[in-house]
Amino acid sequence: MRPGNEVKTERARRLRENSTDAENALWSRLRGRRLGGHKFVRQEPIGVYTVDFVCRESRLIVEVDGGQHAESQTDVARDNWFRAHNYRVLRFWNNDVLGNIGGVLETIVSVLAEAPPHPER
């Protein structure tokens, strides 16, 4: 394992163990290729960041945010970094996931249909 990866892996593990109700609700719909056969993973390190959910094949990141994220400059910087690395980013509020999971899933499916495939390396 590359230096620093242990720290990222441990942080991701802690985040998975302390998921919010909204993250758990969305994960139950994304896990096991339940959403159109797309493989999502949760609390995944990408660069210096850890994202809530990512479909690497479609380069789509899904973040579930609480009130602490309102107008966060940190989130703007994160999203800009991801976009610069050819990821698409969707953000949903916790209450949207908990109160309108169907609408959230429809949005994700719609974006997955548009998302470019993972670039060849």
Regions found by a protein language model. Name each.
Residues 14-20, 44-112:
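Basic, amphipathic alpha-helical patches used to engage nucleic acids or provide basic targeting signals
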Residues 1-39, 112-121:
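Solvent-exposed, charged helical/coil patches
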